[in-house]
Regions:
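Paired acidic/hydrophobic, glycine-rich loop segments that form the ligand-binding mouth/hinge
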Residues: 82-89, 223-224, 240-245, 260
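A bilobed periplasmic-binding-protein/Venus flytrap-type ligand-binding module shared by bacterial periplasmic
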Residues: 143-150, 187-188, 270-284, 300-304
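Mature extracytoplasmic/periplasmic domains
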Residues: 276-342
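Conserved C-terminal helix/tail region of periplasmic/extracytoplasmic solute-binding proteins
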Residues: 336-368
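Early extracytoplasmic/lumenal segment of secretory-pathway proteins
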Residues: 23-98
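Periplasmic-binding protein-like
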Residues: 140, 207-216, 253-279, 323
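A ligand-binding cleft/hinge motif common to bilobed small-molecule-binding domains
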Residues: 94-97, 241-258
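Extracytoplasmic ligand-binding site segments that recognize negatively charged/polar headgroups
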Residues: 40-47, 84-85, 90-231
Length: 368
């Protein structure tokens, strides 16, 4: 056999070896990790920024289970020790409750990676983002919006302006469904220090002060049950100011129904990741949580949807929306210039004390 033929056959053999190896690599069954999350643009953003990259980096087949929040499925899984889900995306109030009930694994905060800029995790995450059983993913806020061009050059800028009917007349739209958000906003706009708000609301005097502040709007108050309705009120003139969810401001802008925004005293909450207690894939689940709450992953989500990264270091990595080309930074609660006076809603406090306060709120509401 000639040397040339030997080389050719050797080369063919090498190619076949590579092809066979590739076949077995592609056909092998990857381990599955199932993450329960939400449908719609948020779940789509997580798929693009977290689930696919984690699967590629760690050789996992990430399955997505859609749910509507709450704890019923988690309670059944942990109670029966039959686990359909390995990681869950929670609204923070549910994560707090699940942690208190012993339904979630403890998460070692010291194991979380530093931010992309080197900031240690314990200094990088926003307040309330890291707890005994959860790690924050995104921040969303109730903010103040007002009808554009209504006040000319005298642009409202602060939460106090929401209550200033003399300078900025017109109807005010507030959330009807709960005292939460309304009482905090009233006290902050009345000049109370943020650190004093929840101590004050433990007392009749503090609640009275909040309700008196809200009562200064009597005769100008209208109510909403859905934040999208508040945007509609601003657009059609039923309201001059409204408290709204920041995501609805983004949606309105995409449909050319934009409103003007005041970020002062935004009231923020979080979505977080947690791991069901006793699940068989705890190690992989924890690995996913660390990956998904890294700076790059959180920035990727914020490039798709208007929810602020729960880590400050992620902001510099946020890009324009890949499909729409929209600059996302103006819509993010945690963006520079937006977060300086942000107030963290204390969901654990509301779980403990809300049942005592809500009846008082309903009585006051009926009097308006």
């Amino acid at each position: 056999m000639s040397r040339r033929m030997t080389i050719i056959l050797g080369a063919i053999g090498a190619v076949l070896l590579v092809l066979v190896g590739a076949y077995f690599w592609l056909s092998r069954t990857l381990p599955v990790l199932t993450v329960a999350t939400w449908s719609g643009p948020y779940g789509h953003a997580q798929t693009k920024a977290m689930f696919i990259p984690f699967g590629d980096a760690k050789d996992y087949d990430v399955h997505i289970a859609l749910y509507d929040g709450g704890l019923s499925e988690l309670q059944q899984m942990v109670g029966n020790k039959r686990y359909d889900w390995d990681v869950m995306d929670f609204e923070l109030p549910d994560a707090i409750a699940a942690c208190r009930m012993g339904l979630l694994e403890h998460i070692d905060a010291a194991s979380l990676p530093a931010g992309a800029d080197g900031t240690p995790a314990n200094k990088d995450f926003v307040r309330n983002a890291v707890g005994p059983c959860w790690v924050g993913s995104v921040v969303y806020s109730q903010i103040i919006a007002y009808a554009p061009n209504r006040y000319g050059a005298a642009r409202p800028q602060t939460a106090a302006d929401f209550f200033d009917l003399a300078r900025f007349p017109g109807p005010r739209a507030l959330r009807r469904t709960s005292a939460k958000f309304n009482l905090e906003l009233a006290l902050l706009a009345d000049g109370m220090k943020p650190s004093d708000v929840y101590d004050a609301l433990l007392t009749p005097v503090g609640i009275d002060r909040a309700l008196r502040k809200l009562a200064t709007l009597k005769g100008s108050l209208v109510w909403w049950n859905n934040s999208a309705d508040a945007i509609a009120m601003l657009n059609d003139g039923r309201a001059a100011f409204a408290t709204v969810l920041n995501g609805d401001v983004y949606d309105a802008a995409q449909h050319h129904r934009g409103v003007s925004v005041i970020w002062d005293r935004q009231l923020y909450e979080l979505d977080v990741f947690g791991v069901p207690k006793g699940g068989p894939k705890k190690e992989a689940a924890m690995d996913f949580v660390r990956f998904a709450t890294g700076s790059q992953s959180l920035a990727g989500v914020a490039s798709w949807v208007p929810y602020g990264p729960a880590r400050r270091s992620a902001l510099a990595l946020v890009r324009n929306n890949p499909e729409l080309g929209t600059d996302m930074t103006p819509f993010l609660p945690t963006a520079p210039g937006h977060f300086a006076t942000a107030f963290a809603i204390d969901d654990e406090w509301w779980q403990l004390h809300g049942p005592d306060i809500e009846p008082r709120w309903q009585v006051w509401l009926a009097s308006q």
